[in-house]
């Protein structure tokens, strides 16, 4: 059973503490892991020189400032609520993660906190993280609220996204990926429709950095197996080393899915998706890559998808080159503003 803690209008379920989490708590109830410390005041980054809050104290929110509006979503480890600041009426998404969770999820949360801090307010194509807290067994992350949901939500509503709007979406996502890859040396590792969020202003932003990886340089590689396997590149599915271009494969599949209205790799005789990982791996690794049907889409779109979905990583175009692709130049954001996408 869980007890409930009342904090400024938010009813937060407090999990029964398990022994595993105790290793990461100080005597004062501060959550610490690697170089971060998190408490009811916020996130602190610990270095050999100093320990300071990630944001100036006078600029910090507190959980007591926020009141719940409604639940946006729930998962096994927590929930996301729409919340309102009592004094400013600003709206946020509050992600709450219960810390009676397994080791893998804990590591993902800590990684997300670190990535959020690295990218804080520095790129308009990444969902902003305003503050993070730890209190009574729950990590709370205050995020920018994207009021139209994800591309996955849009597909459910519209079935397919028209090609001109996909050019605008691709342009914004590629700018976000270019920042992650070239400036922050981060591989997202989980680009998919549900992690690309959109708002009424027509902005598309990258979210969810729980499985992202920070590399030491623009030429470095990784070899760990994390992320949503259906969108993984062949080298990742095959257990080989991979780099930034693995995100390009995932983006290509995502955009093609938005265009078709279904996941491009379809199980034989099924429409509901993949239940067998090894069948999908066999198809992605050993068969020719999927492509945009030329009888349904423009040559520019087909070329763009082909530039992303290449089995050899070196054959995929970089974010910088894709931003110059004719498909992105063909449609203007002014003419096809995403606020008109219905």
From Swiss-Prot:
EC number(s) recorded for this UniProt protein: 2.7.12.2
Specify the taxonomic lineage: Eukaryota, Viridiplantae, Streptophyta, Embryophyta, Bryophyta
Q: Which gene is annotated as encoding this protein in its UniProt record?
A: MKK1b
GO-annotated molecular function: ATP binding; MAP kinase kinase activity; protein serine kinase activity; protein serine/threonine kinase activity; protein tyrosine kinase activity
Question: Any idea which positions bind ATP?
Answer: 72-80, 95
Induction notes from the record:
Slightly induced in response to chitosan.
Start and end residues of each Protein kinase domain: 66-328
Q: What is the source species?
A: Physcomitrium patens (Spreading-leaved earth moss)
Q: Report the protein name in the record.
A: Mitogen-activated protein kinase kinase 1b
Record-linked SUPFAM superfamilies? Protein kinase-like (PK-like) (SSF56112)
């Amino acid at each position: 059973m869980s007890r409930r803690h009342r904090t400024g209008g938010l009813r937060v379920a407090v999990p029964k503490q398990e022994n595993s989490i105790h290793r990461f708590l100080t005597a004062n109830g501060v959550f610490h892991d690697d170089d971060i410390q998190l408490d009811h005041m916020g996130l602190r980054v610990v270095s050999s020189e100093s320990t300071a809050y990630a944001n100036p104290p006078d600029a910090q929110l507190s959980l007591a400032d926020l009141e719940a509006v409604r639940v946006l979503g729930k998962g096994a480890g927590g929930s996301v609520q729409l919340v309102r600041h009592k004094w400013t009426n600003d709206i946020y998404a509050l992600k709450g993660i219960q810390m009676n969770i397994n080791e893998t999820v804990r590591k993902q949360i800590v990684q997300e906190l670190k990535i959020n801090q690295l990218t804080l307010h520095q790129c308009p194509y990444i969902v902003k993280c305003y503050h993070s807290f730890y209190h009574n067994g729950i990590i709370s992350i205050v995020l920018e609220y994207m009021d139209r949901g994800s591309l996955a939500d849009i597909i459910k509503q519209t079935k397919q996204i028209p090609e001109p709007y996909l050019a605008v979406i691709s342009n914004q996502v590629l700018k976000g990926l270019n920042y992650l890859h070239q400036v922050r040396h981060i591989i997202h590792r989980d680009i998919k429709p549900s992690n690309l969020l959109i708002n009424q202003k027509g902005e598309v932003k990258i979210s969810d950095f729980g499985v992202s990886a920070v590399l030491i340089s623009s030429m470095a590689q990784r070899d760990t197996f994390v992320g949503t396997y259906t969108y993984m590149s062949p080298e990742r599915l095959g257990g080989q080393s991979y780099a930034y271009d693995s995100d390009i494969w995932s983006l290509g599949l995502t955009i093609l899915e938005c265009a078709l209205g279904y996941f491009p790799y379809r199980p034989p005789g099924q429409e509901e998706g993949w239940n067998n990982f090894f069948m999908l791996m066999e198809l992605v690794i050993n068969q020719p890559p999927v492509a945009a049907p030329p009888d349904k889409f423009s040559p520019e779109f087909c070329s763009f998808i082909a530039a992303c979905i290449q089995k050899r990583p070196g054959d995929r175009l970089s974010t910088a080159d894709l931003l110059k692709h004719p498909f992105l130049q063909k449609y203007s954001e002014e003419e096809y503003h995403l606020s008109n996408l219905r």
